[in-house]
């Protein structure tokens, strides 16, 4: 089985490469920047311009599409560039699209673009599997709990997460390779739904920190959707 991993320099892409190493697959990777210490064949490609896409997808059976851009050129990469990629996949046996839980319910631009990409994939002729996951542990840590301010975590304490280990999700995606196209799967979620305040309390206890917690409220549809747990799924508790 010949596999292409896009976005091989990102967090999910790196986790995929770590676990694909040593498995009985022919693996090719593609990105704009060549990863350090590459163990696989690397091909340059750019979703923004479309440059290198044909060479990247040539002679592969399965694509795991880990390329994404939450903050920069999001529309051009998540939608416009994605359309360019889909147009070159007539020969593909399976396209695995990692996505995010709740993107159809949370009013956030990047999520709307991911949902648009899901719809483009569904309406294409490409055989696909869509696998949605909740936020990674590292995302919650780096975005909200990485640096206390004057020995206090100043956080929107009521918002909820069901964070998951990126390596667990990567392992799950690799297991899908030999299962063929399955459409949209059940959500892949972390084991516990917790408020950000509860996460901060747990971090303080585990690390024996002396930091305090200051929970502050926000307003708006995005904040309310996270309080309601639209980014979680209590029926799916996985990794």
Across the structure, where does each feature detected by a protein language model lie?
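Conserved glycine-rich Rossmann-like NAD(P)H-binding loop of the short-chain dehydrogenase/reductase
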Residues: 25-32
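Short-chain dehydrogenase/reductase
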Residues: 6, 75, 79, 107-115, ...
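Substrate-positioning beta->alpha
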Residues: 132-138, 155-175, 184
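Conserved beta-loop-beta element that borders a ligand/cofactor-binding pocket
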Residues: 99, 119-139
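N-terminal Rossmann NAD(P)H-binding glycine-rich loop of SDR-like oxidoreductase domains
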Residues: 1-25
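Mid/C-terminal beta-alpha module of Rossmann-like enzyme folds, strongest
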Residues: 2, 10-11, 167-239
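SDR active-site strand-loop-helix element
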Residues: 6, 30, 66-67, 95-100, ...
